[in-house]
Amino acid sequence: MSRPRRRGRDIHGVLLLDKPQGMSSNDVLQKVKRIYNANRAGHTGALDPLATGMLPICLGEATKFSQYLLDSDKRYRVIARLGQRTDTSDADGQIVQERPVTFSAEQLASALETFRGDIEQIPSMYSALKYQGKKLYEYARQGIEVPREARPITVYELLFIRHEGNELELEVHCSKGTYIRTIIDDLGEKLGCGAHVTYLRRLTVSKYPVDRMVTLEHLQTLVAQAEQQGVPAAQLLDPLLMPMDSPASDYPVVNLPLTSSVYFKNGNPVRTTGAPLKGLVRVTEGEDDKFIGMGEIDDEGRVAPRRLVVEYPA
């Protein structure tokens, strides 16, 4: 029986997309997948339809390493509407309460301080977290509220940008699992007036360079240019991709000689020099430092394979 043919190109890398407002992260993902004609694609942490900004999209083998970006810290710019609380904690929801805005500058500064550092956060019912196998927002849309446990998060930096009338603008540098909508909702309750998000932009993810972000419009323009020039679209699109191992760029690198890497790629732990004492590592092979997967240092100090790059035939 013949092996089923994979649909699309074997293209591997990470595209830093500047997500437009009003589209779901999955809709954007599918558009990018079609533009690149990629056989596989996945994003690394959804943005709400209201939100814009950096959405790393992994293509091909890079999807295996997207989990490491989910664990990375992120930075956001957010504008909140004070005096109104909504059921979703953002402007897409229904207003459930309106109160006057009467706090002082000192009270605002004091309230903001309580959200800095290591804190606990109860996720919104309008989130993709699951309860008994079902997403929270699915319960919320049915008018059902289920118990949620507070989760530890870290807010590394919470910058006050401006407060004008009923608008408050902040910049937030936070750990994985942080819901900006929940921070704004909780802040509004602490200030006694209620609040919801009207604008949210993800500025950075991990250490990815902001100047490498591209829009859907730019991708579509490149496809049109390629057609006009009579060249494959891939010739203009592929240089936009970050390396497939970039989601794991925070991990140390272990380079294996070719004599050892063959065993590693076959699923065997191997001994090496210069490896850290424990933890995950990026594994490369040979003098050209070709990335071959993620490994973990075992109890005997060997590098054991955890996620391997599959080398497809041309």
Curated annotation (Swiss-Prot):
SUPFAM superfamilies associated with the record: Pseudouridine synthase, PUA domain-like
Keyword tRNA processing among UniProt keywords: yes
Signal peptide interval: none
Binding site for substrate: 43, 76, 179, 200
Highest taxon above the source species: Bacteria
GO BP field: mRNA pseudouridine synthesis; tRNA modification; tRNA pseudouridine synthesis
Keywords attached to this entry: Isomerase, tRNA processing
Example of a GO MF term: tRNA pseudouridine(55) synthase activity
Enzyme Commission no: 5.4.99.25
Pfam families the UniProt entry points to: TruB-C_2, TruB_C_2, TruB_N
The reaction(s) this protein catalyses: uridine(55) in tRNA = pseudouridine(55) in tRNA
Active-site residues, as the UniProt record annotates them: 48 (nucleophile)
PANTHER family found in the cross-reference section: PSEUDOURIDYLATE SYNTHASE TRUB1, TRNA-PSEUDOURIDINE SYNTHASE
Family of this protein: Belongs to the pseudouridine synthase TruB family. Type 1 subfamily.
Function: Responsible for synthesis of pseudouridine from uracil-55 in the psi GC loop of transfer RNAs.
Protein name: tRNA pseudouridine synthase B
Organism: Salmonella typhimurium (strain LT2 / SGSC1412 / ATCC 700720)
Organism lineage: Bacteria, Pseudomonadati, Pseudomonadota, Gammaproteobacteria, Enterobacterales
